[in-house]
Amino acid sequence: MLFSPPLQRATLIQRYKRFLADVITPDGTTLTLHCPNTGAMTGCATPGDTVWYSTSENTKRKYPHTWELTETQFGAFICVNTLRANQLTKEAIQENRLPALAGYNILKSEVKYGAERSRIDFMLQADFRPDCYIEVKSVTLAEKENGYFPDAITERGQKHLRELMGVAAAGHRAVVVFAVLHSAITRFSPARHIDIKYAQLLSEAQNKGVEVLAYKAELSAQKMELNEPVPITL
């Protein structure tokens, strides 16, 4: 995924009201950015960090600038735009960069499924193969080189795991992909210290046939690409 037009650089003043952030540009202008992340963003929004933002061509938007990346004062890149996790995963599947998800010729997005009336991020289909249901989660919480999900209690995430267990029980492939969007992370675990229920459900889901995968994105202010498998400890 190439950023076109190129991202612009600023320095973070503060994030507030969950969806907004104030930054100061190199010429001293203060801007308010849209923050497309509802999570805690722990370690991703420290005042003084470098922010890379995109600008929409839609002149009717109240906040035309969107916070895409954080470049921390320690040199790590973090993609804070949670929408990018799905885009990067879709791109990687279509370009056959994820061997575990190769061999399908049809990819559908936002398909309704499950007893709790959810929408799956992606469904893959091919002749003579079971349908493959994929739920994608964005991983940005880091402690040293360890990556964790979630960064706050997520009842929605718990629901998705229950739905995936139902998919597996029905004879389909069920997959959860953790898209690691933090350059300092080298391994992944569920955040038991934050959401013990989610961690327990993830282990249960794996035991019941749900595949658990984690891939790391190569991040820069110019492009992003999801391709590197990350070790998982449940």
Curated annotation (Swiss-Prot):
Q: Which residues bind DNA?
A: 201-220
Positions in coiled-coil regions: none
Give UniProt keywords alphabetically: DNA-binding
Which ranges does the record mark as transmembrane? none
Superkingdom of the organism of origin: Bacteria
Molecular function GO terms recorded? DNA binding
Q: Which Pfam families match?
A: SfsA, SfsA_N
Q: Can you tell me which family this protein belongs to?
A: Belongs to the SfsA family.
Q: What does this protein do?
A: Binds to DNA non-specifically. Could be a regulatory factor involved in maltose metabolism.
Name the UniProt record assigns to this protein: Sugar fermentation stimulation protein A
- What organism is listed for this UniProt entry? Salmonella paratyphi A (strain AKU_12601)
